[in-house]
Amino acid sequence: VKGAEAMGQGHGWEGAVLKLLRGKDFVFTVTGAEQVTEHYRRVHLTDGGMLAVTGVHPTMWVRLWFEAAGKPHQRAYTLVDPDPAAGTFSLEFALHDGHASDWARTAKPGDTIEATVQGTAFTEPDPAPSHILAIGDPASLPAINSLLTALPSTPTTIWFETPTEAVETAETAGAAPELQASVSVATSRPDAGPSAAAPVAIRSDVVEDEAGSAVEPAGHGAGAAVLSGAQDPSDGVRDRAAVPIPTPGAGGLPLRLDPAHHDFRPIARQDAGARLITQVKADAPALLAETPDPYVWIACDTATTRSLAAYFRKELGLPKHRMHALGYWRP
């Protein structure tokens, strides 16, 4: 306990606030890393006892602490394939210039990093979605995977914003090997017991925009953590077999798609997200009209997220409880 208290005191005013909000501190240890693509890296870690304390739920995320100019800063990342029994999980990073990416690029076995758990939770929409409309980009890829894993048989349309060259290459050259995505097929294990369930999360550092939807002010990492592989609290542990299939526009990223249920629509990023907004507005009205209980999930840059959240609430009349919107990064 003393060690955790000292850790929290070393995190500056942000750490002090999280401590007041009953945040729990842990130290993770790196066990390995792999370069998924040139700009996307996966780091494997042990949890420092975290999962035994917190349990696991879909889209679960943690706050990692990085030092910049002698001051601590926290960034949030979604857990990938958390295993409470083994005390392990992975994190995925969309690499760019910044202290979090610098750490991920050089992370090696034995390295440690401090983390705080506060604010993460998951509440399955009620009634259950008849169709999910998910809108994201590489920063929110882990959370998209997590959502798909939690509701594997729900029809889902995914608008995925990518760097321009990824979509252009796919459109002109077909599904080249470097653009294939690793897709996981989830199958229930009847012998697996239920995982610890925990009651999408409105975070302490999230503010509501003019549409009444939660939009994080800054810095959800890189992706904010992928929840690909998190356990479904109702179904227990799931096995996942990676099946590489052509996914034009994915840029080689590890999307966990099921062609029987998921409609993947890559959109090249142009005009600071304007092209994505235009495409979603063109597609969404018909999709919403076709389904009785839609659920909209948005996790793009803050400006795009605010614009789309306002569109669904004000222009399409979507009830607030049928939408989850978080800005993951600032352009």
Residue ranges of each PLM-predicted region?
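Short basic-hydrophobic amphipathic alpha-helical segments used for membrane targeting/insertion
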Residues: 175, 188-193
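Hydrophobic alpha-helical membrane-insertion segments
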Residues: 188, 231-233
